[in-house]
């Protein structure tokens, strides 16, 4: 039996929860069975804790020899326990990685993180950069590359028309100064394009530029169906000249889910040239890679309607893959093949 373990999700405004929920639906469609308790949505932390704990406790009793269990990582507190119990029951474990704590929040050392992940028989990683990092840190099991996070939201993108010299760039996600200080630098810059900000945590009183507009939080489905932007920006950190700091440098390993959201919006993306996701952006022809945000002025000035139409056509084709969950399906099937 192929199976997965659901748990409590407090809300779906957090990128990690959105992605995990999409993956659960993809696995259900692939015929996977949930061996934990049903998915719950308790906002109360105590209720959520006990709902997840109860689900973890039933997992060992529902596993059998030869089963393949997919876990979405990180799992607070229970990951190692679930892996060990699965192996005792004769099951194999596939771990689908969403975040590496040792590289993002630095709460774990690489050694501790790899010790945990060493309990898994196979891993699904974001990209080739993360695959190399995992291998260099000693992992010996099978590894499949996710390529890009699927985004299966049931929404249809708005129709976009490219007007020369009238570029609107969408930036959606966490907007706090701690994670994205670069936004405050943009908010005080003279720009030849508009920046449309969607999300929580931005101090709009700091906006001095007439080209930066803060819209607050909007649901992903509404953003997909209603935005009228030209590009989606994938950038983190404290500088407009490079993705720096803990969050910025993490882009060298991480595939931000906002990239997939922009693709579902039918927006070509602008990404940092050193970001791991740049490999897929170039391969699929779905955007442009820049060294600095100061390069955007040149892009806006030089891109032709024909060039934009070609990017958008590629984006629309790739959007179909993400909506149907094909990246996740392919990666899981690779791991299942490895575990035969």
Please name every model-derived segment:
Residues 1-90, 272-277:
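N-terminal pre-catalytic "stem/leader" segment of glycosyltransferase-like enzymes
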Residues 51, 100-115, 152:
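Nucleotide-sugar donor phosphate/pyrophosphate-binding loop at the beta->alpha transition
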Residues 76, 129-131, 269, 276-277, ...:
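Alpha-helix capping/helix-boundary segments
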Residues 105-108, 118-143:
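A short, active-site helix/loop in glycosyltransferases that binds the activated sugar's phosphate group
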Residues 147, 160, 291-298, 304-340:
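A charged, aromatic-enriched C-terminal amphipathic alpha-helix characteristic of glycosyltransferases
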Residues 152-225:
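Conserved catalytic-core segment of nucleotide-activated headgroup transferases in glycan assembly
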Residues 224-265, 271-274, 278-279:
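Nucleotide-sugar-dependent
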